[in-house]
UniProtKB/Swiss-Prot annotation:
Protein name (Swiss-Prot/TrEMBL): Diaminopimelate epimerase
Record GO terms (molecular function): diaminopimelate epimerase activity
Organism: Pseudomonas syringae pv. syringae (strain B728a)
UniProt: substrate binding residues: 13, 46, 66, 76-77, 159, 192, 210-211, 220-221
Residues with site note (Could be important to modulate the pK values of the two catalytic cysteine residues): 161, 210
GO BP of this protein: lysine biosynthetic process via diaminopimelate
Length: 276
């Protein structure tokens, strides 16, 4: 059978989006791996599935697969593309949408200027909830990475993140430390790794090594996690701007117990069909 799909991106973090509300198909991890290959498939960082909700209090169910076939809990840039997609496809007429993910419910707000704000929910710091192996909760942890002591914050934005502060974003050891920390035994579910350079109290630069995808042009949950880490450690103030290789996100966080708000663009690239 042929399935209609849409290619989209949020700041260069690119997605294949499938409407499984009006189309019916059983998508498996092997399909994500096959389609995600940039040489022999469609090519993307993540596959996003738009499904009918299980919960009557929400509008849609949102599932995410990395290009390696692994299913993940959350994707912030994908959430903005999800909102743009369901509106453009007339799956809803609402400008404010509630969506269930593997990690909980998020709220999407399509603004009049075309930007999309996502209520990502409150960050989680309890090690067991990230998950991260630590004797007790802390703002900063020192982790032994191949004999090198690396300081990092650990936080969950519905998916696990480690955040490292660096002095030079261009020479940050993303490809050296990224995969080592991603697979570090203290992160039993693997982890996304953010390399953060603080420019001033309102602006920072960020590169992210994403779990199951490698370095991407942008990572929405990574930007949220980096902002939370920077505010928690007293480096920055809310609201703030995070510059990623693919562009800029605006992040707001009022502190523990409060939701993180992320605002940025979502772009449709093309429509296509793929054989299942």
């Amino acid at each position: 059978m042929l399935l209609r799909f849409t290619k989209m991106h949020g700041l260069g973090n690119d997605f294949m989006v499938l409407d499984l509300v009006s189309q019916h198909a059983h998508i498996l991890p092997k399909h994500a791996k096959q389609w995600g290959d940039r040489h022999t498939g469609i090519g993307f960082d993540q596959l996003l599935l738009v499904e009918a909700p299980n919960n009557p209090d929400v509008d849609f169910r949102y599932r995410i697969f990395n290009s390696d076939g692994s299913e993940v809990e959350q994707c912030g840039n994908g959430a903005r593309c999800f909102a743009r997609f369901v509106l453009d496809k007339r799956l809803t007429a609402k400008k404010q949408i509630r969506v269930e993910t593997k990690s909980g419910i998020i709220e999407l707000d399509i603004r009049s200027d075309g930007q999309i704000s996502v209520d990502m929910g409150p960050p989680r710091f309890v090690p067991e909830e990230i998950p991260f192996e630590a004797a007790e909760q802390a703002t900063c942890y020192t982790v032994d990475v191949d004999g090198q002591h690396v300081d990092m914050a650990a936080v969950s934005m519905g998916n696990p993140h480690a955040v490292l502060r660096v002095d030079d974003i261009n020479n940050a050891p993303v490809h050296e430390l990224g995969p080592k920390i991603e697979h570090h035994p203290r992160f039993p579910a693997r982890v996304n790794v953010g390399f953060l350079h603080v420019v001033d109290r309102q602006r920072a630069q960020l590169r992210v090594w994403e779990r199951g995808a490698g370095e991407t042009q942008a990572c929405g949950t990574g930007a949220c996690a980096a902002a939370v880490a920077a505010i928690s450690q007293g480096w920055m103030d809310s609201p703030l701007l995070i510059d990623l290789p693919g562009g800029r996100l605006s992040i707001e966080w009022a502190g523990p117990g409060h939701s993180v708000m992320m605002t940025g663009p979502a772009v449709r690239v093309y429509e296509g069909q793929v054989r299942l």
